[in-house]
Amino acid sequence: MKFVVFLCAIAAVVATIQGQEQQQQQQLPATIDHDQVKPFPQPQPVTISERAAMKFKPQLHVVDGCHPYPAVNDAGETGGGLKTTGSPTAGCKGSGWGSQVYGRSTWHRDVWAIMYSWYFPKDSPSTGLGHRHDWEHVIVWISNPDVPNPTILAVTPSAHSGYSKYAPPSADTVDGTSIKVRYESTYPMNHATDVTTEAGAFQDLIMWDQMTDAARNALNTVSFGDANVPMNDGNFVPKLDKAWPF
């Protein structure tokens, strides 16, 4: 009799553990095909920070490799990325749903910093090289968002876990209030961003605070392998510290 009770107790524990594992799996954000992630529509800017982010939105010139894709949708589903097979542009020449640039801004050491981030399904300078997923970003440092004509003080595009720093940027890399950024690899190195004199394309801007809770949670918790989400809660301020150009 005691043995039967013991077996029942073990079965109950196993069932509880399995139930908890299933619940945890159900709570994890889902991963979908990279070309099925729908971007957030660009909202009308309302706040001071949103208007400044829209005013200084950069343009991206893709020299080689993938075009930027949405990384997450409003339900918190993230793109699964691509293997490094095929050419650097294979399977990632642009999303049929449209693209996205992600923004987040704050005061940092008395300078207003606006981080703009792009997601790419793979970072592959050549077939078999590189890795699944890529995140790149540029930080635009301005004087004050709450004045009629803020000044661009510096620009710091991301490059191989570090930054190029321009304080101030050259006039020929700025189109009005828009920094011109290029995305390029120098074989055999992976892709990076830098400023350029070439005009680029704009993507719909969504700010961190404008996204759904599900989307922010996904970007805070989902692993993108060798790439990390620059504007999430764990990376945003440390990257501003590292990119400080003054």
From Swiss-Prot:
Motif (Conserved undecapeptide motif I): 113-123
Membrane-spanning parts: none
InterPro entries on file: NPP1
Recorded superkingdom: Eukaryota
Pfam name, any one: NPP1
Induction field: Expression reached the highest levels at 3 days after inoculation of pepper leaves, followed by a gradual decline.
Signal sequence interval, chain numbering: 1-19
Cellular localisation: Secreted
Family of the protein in this entry: Belongs to the Necrosis inducing protein (NPP1) family.
Domain notes: Key residues/motif important for the effector activities are degenerated in most NLPs, including the nlp24 peptide consisting of the conserved region I (11-aa immunogenic part) and conserved region II (the heptapeptide GHRHDWE motif) that is important for phytotoxic activity.
Stated name of the protein: NLP effector protein 2
Gene name for this UniProt entry: NLP2
